[in-house]
């Protein structure tokens, strides 16, 4: 049994919890805090000295020691963190609201990796007194739940940071057709700047957050592209929208000051409003009046430069230079890709992390936030991007990935190479490594079998065996994945479906146009019922995965999507049966020529593409209509 000296009672209690994840042999470890290296471990023959600079770094040191002792008796390790703060932000606004138990599990793993901060992105998924439509049927956290999560983070000397929205990205709230909500709206998902009831709402946001001990908050304000162009324009006429942003920011910062908060905000809108073509990554000319405002505000807010796409250090460096025109107080947010369907993309996350880390170090950035977004339904599992999180931890503490696999196996029980096989549904054989967002995992699954509008973006002769092999690989890994086995079981079933579905629309059309009624009958009576059975099983596995990680709210969207898919397969069966029986003389859906879904990669020599909006994948008809 391992023996520690120099621990506080709280640290001893936390280490007991972490023994559920890692194991240490019978050794003696003398622990002390030091102002030298972030982590230092020395010793041999069962006697070790461990020092840490910041309290949260003790738990990474524990993991690093466990890894070293599994390989040998003599240990001499020193690590120096490049970043004062390393955070993970979980998206709890795209239907998947991390449940409290899973938040605690995530905190434990992050502690072992060396993270200082745990963040939850909550657009409307926290409760505000006097705002019943805010988070209505969305699984909004109560103040007590947030306090419980924060207390658990503090147990491991981690900071909890809420990430909210105080301008845009509030579509789930402002959609409600009641006066008390609509009077707050400018256009689309954007609040009406200058409306006093808007600032009452924002005061209520901070009143809820003030029940926490943390006094650090991200106030959002990103992607408000149409700010000032809806009701604001009708009420006030044309104004300089960069100045309008500054005016709103000042009001929000005043409210934050009232409650004692220091704010961060996503930085993109300043650049989009001041660049010639409205893009984030362009040179900007700052109008003088806006410059005066920014100079007054810049010491009150940290700008977060977010970028999840660049594959070269210089692209990041250029954007850092642009940011420094506005402020020197800059944090960086990179991405752990879990927002392109059911399947993560840890491979691309690794590629961009390597380049972003170089630029962050070169620009003396002191805070890095790794974001786990969940666009269009939060369908990717919360824990599927653990490799991406370990990658950023290694880059922070070591500036290399030489010990990535060893440290990851200590923390999860599985090699990082095996864990990253979760990506397989996105890793088609002919795809370049440096392209983001290509997501066959999603569009092959959701597209219709009679109206397969993405068929031009599939290459069945290579895709079908790829998915079949992926299903086998993932099933094998599941057997050794321990507490993470459910991730591999779900992905294995998904890949089995993709293998059967990727050529189905094409084969139906070929048989129909060839007059091959025997093949049509075989598909209608055997293959389609089998596919429905596979999808029903996947829905069951996915539901278990969702409920293990998240609150139940938001699962209804997946029920609707998969239920619709199943009904469309039934419709295909009946349409084909009617044709085969002579009840109809043609199948109109099969008479339509298939066109490219988009031309994003039209100049490339592969077929796959990006399609991440369910309502455009599932049908060419209109779902959102008046």
Question: Would you name each region that the model predicts?
Answer:
Residues 1, 76-82, 293-295:
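Short boundary motifs at domain starts and secondary-structure transition points
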Residues 2, 15-53:
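Short, well-ordered secondary-structure micro-motifs within conserved domains or adaptor modules
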Residues 2-25, 108, 148-151, 157, ...:
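Substrate-binding groove of N-acetylhexosamine-processing glycoside hydrolases
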Residues 5-6, 31-33, 43, 52, ...:
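Pocket-edge structural micro-motifs
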Residues 7-10, 37-39, 98, 141:
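Alpha-helical hairpin
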Residues 40-43, 173, 229, 275-277, ...:
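Short, well-ordered secondary-structure micro-motifs
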Residues 45-264, 331-334, 339, 346:
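Feature activates predominantly on carbohydrate-active enzymes
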């Amino acid at each position: 049994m391992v023996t520690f000296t120099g621990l506080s009672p709280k640290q001893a209690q936390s280490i007991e919890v972490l023994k559920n994840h890692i194991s240490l042999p019978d050794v003696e470890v003398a622990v002390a805090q030091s102002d030298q290296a972030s982590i230092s471990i020395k010793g041999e023959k069962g006697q070790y000295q461990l020092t840490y600079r910041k309290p949260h770094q003790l738990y990474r040191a524990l993991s690093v020691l466990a890894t070293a002792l599994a390989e040998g008796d003599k240990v001499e390790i020193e690590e120096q963190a490049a970043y004062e703060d390393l955070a993970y932000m979980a998206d709890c606004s795209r239907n998947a609201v991390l449940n409290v138990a899973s938040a605690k599990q995530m905190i434990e793993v992050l502690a072992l990796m060396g993270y200082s901060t745990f963040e939850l992105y909550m657009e409307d998924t926290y409760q505000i007194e006097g705002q019943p439509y805010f988070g209505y049927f969305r699984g909004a956290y109560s103040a007590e739940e947030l306090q419980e999560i924060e207390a658990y983070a503090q147990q491991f000397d981690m900071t909890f940071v809420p990430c909210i929205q105080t301008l845009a990205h509030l579509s789930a709230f402002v959609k409600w057709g009641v006066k008390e909500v609509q009077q707050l709206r400018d256009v689309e998902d954007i609040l009406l700047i200058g409306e006093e009831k808007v600032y009452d709402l924002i005061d209520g946001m901070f009143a809820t957050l003030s029940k926490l001990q943390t006094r650090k908050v991200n106030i959002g304000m990103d992607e408000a592209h149409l700010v000032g162009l809806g009701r604001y324009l009708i009420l006030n006429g044309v104004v300089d929208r960069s100045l309008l942003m500054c005016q709103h920011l000042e009001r929000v910062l005043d409210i934050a000051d009232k409650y004692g908060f220091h704010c961060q905000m996503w930085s993109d809108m300043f650049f989009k409003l001041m660049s010639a073509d409205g893009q984030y990554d362009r040179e900007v000319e700052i109008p003088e009046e806006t410059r005066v405002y920014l100079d007054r505000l810049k010491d009150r807010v940290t700008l977060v430069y977010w970028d999840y796409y660049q594959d070269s250090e210089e692209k990041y460096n250029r954007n850092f230079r642009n940011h420094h025109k506005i402020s020197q107080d800059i944090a960086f947010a990179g991405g752990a890709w879990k927002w392109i369907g059911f399947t993560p993309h840890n491979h691309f996350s690794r590629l961009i992390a390597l380049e972003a880390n170089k630029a962050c170090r070169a620009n003396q950035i002191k805070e890095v936030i790794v974001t786990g977004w969940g666009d269009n339904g939060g369908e990717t599992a919360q824990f599927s991007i653990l490799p991406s999180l370990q990658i950023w931890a290694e880059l922070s503490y070591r500036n290399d990935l030489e010990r990535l696999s060893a440290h990851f196996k200590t923390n999860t029980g599985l090699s990082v190479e095996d864990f990253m096989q979760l990506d397989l549904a996105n890793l088609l054989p002919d795809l370049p490594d440096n392209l983001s967002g290509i997501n066959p995992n999603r569009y092959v699954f959701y597209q219709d079998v009679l109206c397969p509008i993405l068929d031009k973006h599939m290459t069945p002769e290579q895709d079908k065996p790829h998915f079949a092999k992926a299903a086998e690989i993932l099933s094998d890994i599941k057997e050794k994945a321990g507490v993470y086995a459910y991730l591999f079981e779900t992905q294995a079933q998904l890949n089995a479906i993709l293998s059967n579905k990727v050529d189905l629309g094409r084969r139906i059309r070929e048989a129909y146009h060839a007059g091959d009624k025997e093949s049509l009958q075989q598909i209608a009576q055997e293959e389609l019922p089998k596919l429905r059975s596979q999808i029903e099983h996947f829905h069951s596995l996915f539901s278990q995965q969702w409920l293990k990680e998240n609150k139940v709210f938001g699962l209804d969207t997946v029920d609707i999507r998969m239920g619709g898919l199943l009904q469309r397969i039934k419709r295909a069966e009946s349409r084909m049966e009617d044709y085969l029986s002579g009840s109809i003389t043609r199948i109109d859906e099969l008479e339509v020529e298939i066109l490219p879904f988009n031309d994003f990669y039209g100049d490339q020599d592969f077929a796959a593409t990006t399609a991440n909006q369910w309502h455009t994948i599932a049908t060419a008809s209109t779902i959102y209509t008046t």
